Amino acid sequence: MMMGQDEVGSDQTQIIKGKRTKRQRSSSTFVVTAATTVTSTSSSAGGSGGERAVSDEYNSAVSSPVTTDCTQEEEDMAICLIMLARGTVLPSPDLKNSRKIHQKISSENSSFYVYECKTCNRTFSSFQALGGHRASHKKPRTSTEEKTRLPLTQPKSSASEEGQNSHFKVSGSALASQASNIINKANKVHECSICGSEFTSGQALGGHMRRHRTAVTTISPVAATAEVSRNSTEEEIEINIGRSMEQQRKYLPLDLNLPAPEDDLRESKFQGIVFSATPALIDCHY
């Protein structure tokens, strides 16, 4: 009986070793437990019938569903790991809402910066654009506040202060008069001497005077010719008188037929020549 059990145990160990090389490591614990159950059952059974029972129980114990369940879990685990490796981490909402001075966005070939304004949270692609935008925030705003009004009741001043105030009043009135004179000069009205029209500038008055000049020149042709003829006759008379006067100045009252006196020749050369008012006539018996 003991020999039979030893043979069955050796056969089982050979079967277990052969199966262990083909199966995975995870199912080894189950095989060992199955082997212990087989050995316990084989001790109660005897002969060739016991060996068949051991082999049937072992085959039933080491069944395919158990191995498929183990491999399915490992496959699920591997799939989960692959999905985690391929997945991307989504940014949290806190990082999206946080303000950044600038952030770098890199691409395959180039990279650029985004600059954000701290006041209005606008973004710009360059620092120069951000500087120009910041200048709009720094512009001085027009103050709408009214000036403080002086109190109605002023404290009483001394005599010296009153004198100074009167002096300031006089000087202020003089300045006001000078300013009014300047304004009057600036607003001087130019008046036409012919028709009395008033103009604010000398250029306008000059343009107006041209009308009067053109009106004077546009006279009737008959009156114009009469006036021209009268003017021409007067001018001719004046010209003739002028010519006669010039001729009298050129020709002296000298008679060349009179001989020079001998006494005058003996005198000095620098003595002036004297002419008689009524020269004597030669060969005149009257």
From Swiss-Prot:
Main location: nucleus
Disulphide-bridged cysteine pairs: none
Induction comment from the UniProt entry of this chain: By gibberellin and H(2)O(2). Down-regulated by ascorbate.
One GO term describing the cellular component: nucleus
Subcellular location: Nucleus
Chain intervals with Polar residues compositional bias: 154-171
Domain of life: Eukaryota
Location of the region described as Disordered in the Swiss-Prot/TrEMBL record: 1-28, 40-60, 131-171
Tissue distribution of the protein: Expressed in flowers and siliques.
Protein name, as recorded: Zinc finger protein ZAT5
Organism: Arabidopsis thaliana (Mouse-ear cress)
Taxonomic classification: Eukaryota, Viridiplantae, Streptophyta, Embryophyta, Tracheophyta
